[in-house]
Structure formats: C-alpha cells, structure tokens
Swiss-Prot record:
Pfam families: YdjC. Signal peptide: none annotated. InterPro entries: COD_ChbG_bac, Glyco_hydro/deAcase_b/a-brl, YdjC-like. This is Carbohydrate deacetylase. Its EC number is 3.5.1.-. Homodimer. Probably catalyzes the deacetylation of acetylated carbohydrates an important step in the degradation of oligosaccharides. PANTHER family: CARBOHYDRATE DEACETYLASE, YDJC DEACETYLASE FAMILY MEMBER. SUPFAM superfamilies: Glycoside hydrolase/deacetylase. It comes from Enterococcus faecalis (strain ATCC 700802 / V583). Its cofactor is Mg(2+). Mg(2+) binds at H129.
C-alpha cells in the first residue's frame, strides 16, 4: 500500500464560463481535487458562485497572474504602470519579464489575493499563471513573501529554476515534494497519466502535484487562448474509469493542499 498523496490541480478556474464548467466536471466526475482561480478575470465571481453551489468539495487557490491575455490588473493602471501596455492590459508572456517592477508585482499580486478573499473564501494555496514564479527567481521571491504573509502553501517551483538549493528558498512555506507538469498539449493521453502515477509511487517524497487544464470550449476561450481543444481531451481522461482505477490500484490517496503538514 502506497503512502503517497496526489494533488491534481486544474489551472485557470474562472478564465471563461466554459473553463469553469469543465473543471467542475473534472472534479465531480473525475480525479481533479483542486483548482486555482483568476481574480483578474471578469468571470471570477461567477466561477466562485458555481463552485459554491455545484462543487463545494473543490479546493480553490489563487492563480496569480501577470500575463493573462486580454486581462487588466486589479489595481488602477497608474499604480502598476510597469505591468501593462498602452491599453492597460497585461504584457504578453514573451516580453513581460523585461518590463515589470517587482514592487508593483508584489502590490498587484497582493491585491489579487485580497480580491479572492473578498469572494468570501480563503485560498487553499497560491500558484501563478504560466508558472511565472517557477521561471524567474525574483518573481519566486515575491510569491514566497506573499505565501508567508498569508500563511499559504505555494506551488513547487522546481521545474524551471536551475538551482539545487531552490527548496531552501521556501524554508517555512509549505509546498508539495514534487510538481509534475508533463500532462500538457501533445502529451495529453491516458498513457501520460499512468506514467506520472508510476513516478509518484517510485519517487521519494510524500505529496505530489499534477497540474492540468481541463475545460469545455466557448468562443471566449477560442478568442483569448491558443490552448483550446486539448482541454476537452483532458476532461475526458481525468473523468475516465481507467484513470480512477489506476490511482486506486497504486494505493495513491487523492488530496489537496490541506494535506501539507503545517
């Protein structure tokens, strides 16, 4: 019997109404245990209400963003001028790093967390859109500061930061032992999920996370994201009986960030 715990987190909750419904479906009928919501989305409050009514057991964290397409910050433009283009929208992910001021990033991300809590719910954890805190050590520092301020777990940033001592940066911040990002785009398949489950069983550590992007498709998503059709396939796989049985056969316990020890 395995003692492994697995968080399966769906990113982008509240991105569009169809994304929200796809994530709820993957939770209610499938293996998704957790999600992270976008307070900068115009559909955020609608998504939180949908979760309250239709998926009360779904853990929800904050998906901090600096790069959400066609979205604007929570704070007024004059307070975060380095984060936005001339029209007041977030920079594209390909160029934002050279533009942003870290103090403004801290203030905006802090405002996003506060906006989430104004929905009447405390976040389960925090992570970031496009995993920006896992690609830039300075942005990781901002995310860690906010995790400490609010005493929230933070997604493991080990994938992209090329340093052996990155975990030392976390110190008293709770994080899964390992983050598994491989279930994405062309690698979306039942075989990929089964391989990741085997990695969980064979790896050191107790708590693991697989991130995913299940969704239904609407015209809003098609107009805003280049990653659309694979999301439907994710819903199909994450609600499949084969995946449910594979998790049970390996003795893996589905969990959320509350499973991380204080």
């Amino acid at each position: 019997m395995s003692n492994k715990k697995l968080i399966i987190n769906a990113d982008d909750f509240g991105y569009t109404p169809a994304v929200t419904q796809g994530i709820i479906e993957a939770h209610k009928r499938g293996v998704v245990t957790s999600t992270t919501a976008l307070p900068t989305s115009p559909y955020f409050l609608e998504a939180m209400e949908s979760a309250r009514i239709s998926a009360p057991t779904l853990a929800i964290g904050v998906h901090l963003t600096l790069t959400l397409n066609q979205a604007k910050p929570i704070l007024p433009r004059e307070m975060v001028p380095s984060l936005v283009d001339e029209a007041g929208y977030f920079w594209h992910q390909s160029i934002f790093e050279e533009k942003v001021n870290l103090e403004e990033v801290y203030n905006e991300w802090d405002a996003q967390i506060i906006s989430f809590m104004k929905s009447g719910r405390r976040p389960d954890h925090i992570d970031s859109h496009h995993n920006v805190h896992g690609k830039n050590k300075k942005l990781l520092g901002v995310a860690l500061a906010l995790a400490r301020k609010y005493q929230l777990p933070l997604r493991n940033a080990s994938r992209s930061i090329e340093t052996k001592d990155y975990l030392e940066l976390y110190q008293d911040v709770r994080t899964p032992d390992e983050m598994l990002y491989q279930f994405y785009d062309k690698a979306i398949s039942t075989e990929t999920i089964l391989q990741l489950l085997d990695m969980v069983v064979c790896s050191e550590g107790e708590v693991f996370e697989i991130n995913c992007h299940p969704a239904f498709i609407d015209t809003i998503l098609q107009n805003q994201s280049g990653y659309c059709m694979p999301r439907i396939r994710e819903v199909e796989i994450l609600t499949s009986q084969e995946v449910k049985e594979a998790i049970e056969e390996r003795g893996i316990l589905l969990a959320n960030y509350e499973s991380l020890a204080m």
